Amino acid sequence: MIRQATTPRAKLRFYNACRGKLCLGATMPLALELLGKSQPGRFFAGPTLALDIGGSTAWMAGHANPEELAGFLTFCGCSAVVLDEAEAAPPAGWTRARSHTIFGLTPGRQLPEPEADEALWASLTFDRDPPARPVAEALFPARPARRDDFYSELCTKRSRGRARVWALWQGKTLACTVGAYALANGQAYMACGETAEPLRGRGIGGRLIVRLANELSAEGFQPVFLCAPERVHFYTRLGFEKLGEYARYEAPAK
């Protein structure tokens, strides 16, 4: 039976299902810890299952009966789920849509700094602690609801030392940003690397990513992130290690 992760027993099941999972072992327990009271309808657990349903895509650690899982996700209004095929069968009747490659860096290892347009790099201002609002606006310019949720969660995580975001400014314009949005359980889950469109292809994003990953690694964290298929070559070129793969499954068309 899948239930809300609100009781001590359900929370323990949730944490146990996430334990040792790359990426999900940082993001999901941290989200439950910080947001479980304010968003109790977002987190669910089964005997060997953890689910984070913060939107139309569910994030899943562990495993459950495929028929029960399909029915539950449909009831919750989910159209997709990300899971580890090595341990979980997909929801019954759902279709595999794409892979998410897990990249990372062994704690203590340092990557060489990638090439970049040095004149452009020198003209930008590095910001170790940019305001959350312009970061949210740069990442989600056309999705106001997602932007507001992101802003709120980032502020909550930062206030507790559980997130680290860097940025480069070109005057008063945010030129590039990347962050570690879940510092938990020895992992640093990196995400939301974004460069302003006119400046893309000049190396500043890759350099900022590597610098942040190197700093986190030197502090003993394992930097990890999920990568879409079209970005695999980019992160491979930067020197990150491929550590595994998750799969995205989508519900049948109605």
Where are these predicted regions, by residue range?
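N-terminal charged segments
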Residues: 1-88
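Short amphipathic alpha-helix that is part of the acyltransferase structural core
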Residues: 1-28, 99-103, 107-152
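A conserved beta-turn-beta hairpin within the catalytic core of GNAT-like acetyltransferases
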Residues: 53-60, 182-191, 200
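Acyl-donor-binding surface of acyltransferase catalytic domains
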Residues: 53-130, 227, 249-251
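Conserved acetyl-CoA-binding loop-helix of GNAT-fold acetyltransferases
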Residues: 65-72, 191, 195, 201-218, ...
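Conserved acetyl-CoA-binding loop of GNAT-fold acetyltransferases
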Residues: 92-97, 236-246
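A conserved beta-strand-loop-helix scaffold within acyl/acetyltransferase catalytic domains
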Residues: 146-194
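Conserved hydrophobic beta-strand within the GNAT/NAT acetyltransferase core sheet
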Residues: 190, 223-227
